[in-house]
């Protein structure tokens, strides 16, 4: 059974890389019929649903994981990302804060928290988070682009 689900996960991943998200969802559904509590399948299906802009369904997939693994960093970050997409920046930040309690140097959580802070209007605090992410990985493009954008915004206001 394990080799079948691993094979389906690989197929689904390749389909996602090719932009065939609907076909990938079929693979994830097949996996979840076999292994309903598969962490990887639940998270990856959530990401795929997010790519298709089915945000509330994606959130449900992340909740499935967080119900049994409340400290799953991937599920927490993706939940924050989905909430950010819905404009629920404060809620998103609360998920990033959990990640940062678990891993103070998680550059994705630092950067995403900065993005949510920026969208909430706290540009100076966003800059601090982008800068902290870059102090950990100076080549992290998303943090650098976000930092540059935030600084330009500060100069123009």
Residue ranges and their predicted role:
Residues 5-6, 39-40, 73-74, 107-108, ...:
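Helix-start (N-cap) detector for alpha-helical repeat units in TPR-like alpha-solenoids
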Residues 16, 43, 50, 77, ...:
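Position-specific recognition of the canonical hydrophobic site in helix A of tetratricopeptide repeat
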Residues 31, 64-65, 98-99, 132-133:
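Canonical positions in the second alpha-helix
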């Amino acid at each position: 059974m394990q080799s079948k689900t691993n094979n389906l996960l690989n197929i689904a991943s390749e389909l996602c890389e090719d932009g065939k998200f609907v076909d990938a969802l079929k693979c994830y559904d097949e996996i979840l019929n076999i292994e309903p509590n598969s962490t990887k399948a639940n998270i990856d299906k959530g990401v795929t649903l997010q790519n298709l802009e089915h945000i509330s369904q994606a959130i449900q997939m992340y909740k499935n994981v967080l119900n049994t693994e409340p400290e799953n960093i991937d599920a927490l970050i993706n939940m924050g990302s989905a909430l950010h997409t819905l404009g629920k920046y404060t809620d998103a930040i609360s998920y990033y804060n959990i990640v940062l309690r678990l891993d103070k140097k998680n550059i994705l959580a630092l950067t995403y928290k900065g993005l949510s802070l920026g969208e909430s209007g706290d540009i100076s605090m966003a800059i601090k988070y982008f800068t902290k992410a870059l102090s950990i990985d100076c080549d992290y493009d998303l943090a650098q682009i976000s930092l540059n954008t935030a600084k330009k915004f500060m100069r123009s206001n």
